[in-house]
Design a protein with these regions (language model features):
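Peripheral, non-AAA+ core regions of ATP-driven protein-machinery
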Residues: 1-175
Length: 175
């Protein structure tokens, strides 16, 4: 965030995907009671680890971390908790978290990530994601899935005003 001509740019997305994401993030922050900063914000979405050649329509799950980073850069929430895990979620215009597609795949990919420097030795990595997806992600051992319902709840967790319990994994049924 820089203090010159106001602009909110999402670099690396198609025009439509960037416009939709910007609108969801702006609206969710407004619903939270925060004014959108009158500054220059550039978010670069780099696709080097994505197998698809066109990620422009598949990154709505970055709405939550982008919104939280904007709040942290404004000093509205502390930065430290944001680095304690991975935050994923598509925001609705009202600030609610929408279900993710591929939560289990995302959780599995996080297990192989190098967490040194983020987690203390021996701690299990944290994955913050929509509450409806947390039991699915909790199927992966080696990660703690924590379910969120909204941007407001994510802010409360980041500010340590509320605690979350790890999700219980979905029950496996034998047929």
């Amino acid at each position: 965030i820089t203090w010159w001509l106001p602009q909110f740019g999402l670099i690396g997305l198609s025009t439509q995907a960037a416009a939709a994401s910007r609108e969801r993030i702006r609206s969710a922050l407004k619903q939270l009671g925060h004014s959108f900063p009158a500054s220059h914000i550039s978010v670069n979405i780099h696709a080097c680890d994505v197998r698809s050649t066109d990620i422009s329509e598949s990154v709505s799950w970055l709405d939550l971390p982008i919104a939280l980073c904007i709040l942290a850069c404004q000093g509205m929430i502390p930065r430290e908790p944001l680095g304690s895990g991975v935050w994923l979620g598509e925001l609705s215009l009202a600030g609610e978290l929408q279900p993710l597609y591929g939560a289990l795949t995302m959780a599995r990919s996080l297990i192989s990530h190098d967490w040194s420097g983020v987690q203390k030795e021996g701690e299990t990595p944290l994955l913050f994601l929509p509450a409806v997806n947390a039991p699915e992600a909790a199927l992966c051992s080696g990660i703690r899935a924590l379910g969120l319902t909204s941007l407001a709840q994510a802010v409360d967790v980041a500010c340590r005003r509320t605690d979350l319990s790890p999700a219980e994994p979905l029950r496996r049924v034998s047929l």
